[in-house]
């Protein structure tokens, strides 16, 4: 009898005989370390590194992940894992296990960013102006690694693991399209993770409740009357109006928001004019806004539009505001389920030691994983990859961003462990409730 089969067998026996609790608990606690050992095998590690580098060399933007999804499908086929494609344009959804309920989902995003890689190495991006600068190449690789681990122990799975290879996380709201496609129907829970160089290799971080902010984008066109820069009295200067708008927008957080309710409004784009001596007819500004509650988020949205249009009017200009929701949908706050967070701490603690769990503070960054959490219970976490030999490592969305490939076994085994343990514990809980009803 294999180790994983033994754990399942003992867990079910425990439900019939409570005296076996310590035995079943010990068996469950060994699953994560067993998976980590398997994922660290030289052949397994080298396979993951090869996949990650192939993806990194050929980055694709949101909803354009044609070759990436082709690679994912090819690897799933080699494993004998069934899948659906296309889902949400370029997404792939795989299935490992019994094919029946209960269902638990694991998610990885596949898209890259529109930036030129500046890191000089053998597997640098081959596509000009595109780069995996947020670790999504590693995320996809680790989920494929988890799929391989789970497939090797498919007979022991007490249900079905849904493998979500998602397109377009970077502003495209791919998760929303995955939900709309019905992928999460009958799924009990979903888990996602993200690489970070703010934690040491072998550490993980998360928190219960609000974790990442809700986010939205805006752009505004401010129109005046152009003319010669030497004769400003004959113009209506949109650059000056836009400058006043930007300053006024900063007051929304500093003077209108509760200091204990974290919010951000940032103007990150300003375009206007083409000559040193000509005042343009119009300028365009754009930016992002963030908040941890839906109420605060919608209030910011309302006030951003009011401030832009009214401040422009003060300067005798007209303004139109576009929140570009079709192109970049609003992301809700990422809020971790309480029970799933405790489950994550238990599993990661069994794998890495509870001392390697780091309680994180809320971040103003955003994640479209939140769309899943609006539909079903979900949990999001960070996996460390800090490389002390190459410290400091560049932050995500930097052209100098790098992934420490030593983290790949940790992410793959953590994914596989959470799915396996979740299904085992869910079955145990269901049987336990059934036994209690029979006793009544």
UniProtKB/Swiss-Prot annotation:
Q: In which tissues is it expressed?
A: Expressed in leaves, stems, roots, siliques and flowers. Detected in the vascular tissue of cotyledons and roots, in adult leaves, stems, siliques, petals, hydathodes and in silique abscission zones and funicles.
Instruction: Spell out the InterPro entries in the cross-references.
Output: Amidohydrolase, Bact_exopeptidase_dim_dom, ILR1-like_Hyd, Peptidase_M20, Peptidase_M20_dimer
Tell me yes or no: is Hydrolase among this UniProt entry's keywords. Answer: yes
Q: Name one Pfam family in it.
A: M20_dimer
- Cellular location(s): Endoplasmic reticulum lumen
Q: Which Gene3D superfamilies match?
A: 3.30.70.360, Zn peptidases
Q: Where does Mn(2+) 1 bind?
A: 134, 170, 397
Q: What does this protein do?
A: Hydrolyzes certain amino acid conjugates of the plant growth regulator indole-3-acetic acid (IAA), including IAA-Ala, IAA-Asn, IAA-Cys, IAA-Glu, IAA-Met, IAA-Ser and IAA-Gly. Has a lower efficiency with IAA-Phe, IAA-Leu and IAA-Val and no activity with IAA-Ile. Important for IAA-Leu hydrolysis in roots. Also hydrolyzes amino acid conjugates of jasmonic acid and 12-hydroxy jasmonic acid.
Q: What is this protein called?
A: IAA-amino acid hydrolase ILR1-like 4
Organism, scientific name:
Arabidopsis thaliana
């Amino acid at each position: 009898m294999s180790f994983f089969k033994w754990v399942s067998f003992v867990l079910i026996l425990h439900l019939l005989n409570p005296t076996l609790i310590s035995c079943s608990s010990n068996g469950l606690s060994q699953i994560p370390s067993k998976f980590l050992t398997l994922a660290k095998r030289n052949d397994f590690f080298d396979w993951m590194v090869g996949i990650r580098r192939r993806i990194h060399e050929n980055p694709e933007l949101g909803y354009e992940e044609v070759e990436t999804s082709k690679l994912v499908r090819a690897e799933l086929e080699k494993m004998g894992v069934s899948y659906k494609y296309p889902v949400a344009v370029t997404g792939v959804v795989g299935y490992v296990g019994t094919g029946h309920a209960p269902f638990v989902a694991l998610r990885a995003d596949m898209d890259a960013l529109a930036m030129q890689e500046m890191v000089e190495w053998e597997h640098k991006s081959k596509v000009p102006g595109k780069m995996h600068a947020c670790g999504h190449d590693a995320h996809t690789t680790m989920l494929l690694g988890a799929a391989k681990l789970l497939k090797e122990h498919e007979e022991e799975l007490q249900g079905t693991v849904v493998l979500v290879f998602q397109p377009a996380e970077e502003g495209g709201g791919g998760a929303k399209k995955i939900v709309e496609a019905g992928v999460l129907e009958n799924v009990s829970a979903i888990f996602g993770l993200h690489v970070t160089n703010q934690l040491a290799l072998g550490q993980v971080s998360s928190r219960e409740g609000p974790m990442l902010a809700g986010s939205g984008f805006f752009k505004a066109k401010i129109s005046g009357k152009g003319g010669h820069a030497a004769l400003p009295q004959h113009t209506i200067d949109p650059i000056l109006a836009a400058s006043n708008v930007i300053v006024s927008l900063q007051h929304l957080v500093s003077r209108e928001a509760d200091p204990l309710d974290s919010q951000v409004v940032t103007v990150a784009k300003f375009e206007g004019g083409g000559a040193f001596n000509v005042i343009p007819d119009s300028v365009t500004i754009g930016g992002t806004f963030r908040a941890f509650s839906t109420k605060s988020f919608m209030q910011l949205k309302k006030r951003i539009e009011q401030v832009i249009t009214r401040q422009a009017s003060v300067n005798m200009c007209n303004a139109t505001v576009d929140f570009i929701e079709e192109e970049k949908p609003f992301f809700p706050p990422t809020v971790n389920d309480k029970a799933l967070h405790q489950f994550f701490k238990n599993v990661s603690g069994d794998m890495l030691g509870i001392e390697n769990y780091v309680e994180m503070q809320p971040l103003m960054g955003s994640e479209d994983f939140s769309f899943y959490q609006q539909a079903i219970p979900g949990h999001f976490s960070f996996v460390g990859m800090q490389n002390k030999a190459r410290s400091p490592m560049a932050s995500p969305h930097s052209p100098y961003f790098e992934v420490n490939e030593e983290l790949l076994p940790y992410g793959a085994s953590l994914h596989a462990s959470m799915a396996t343990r979740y299904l085992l514990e869910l079955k145990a809980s269901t049987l336990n409730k059934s036994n209690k009803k029979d006793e009544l």
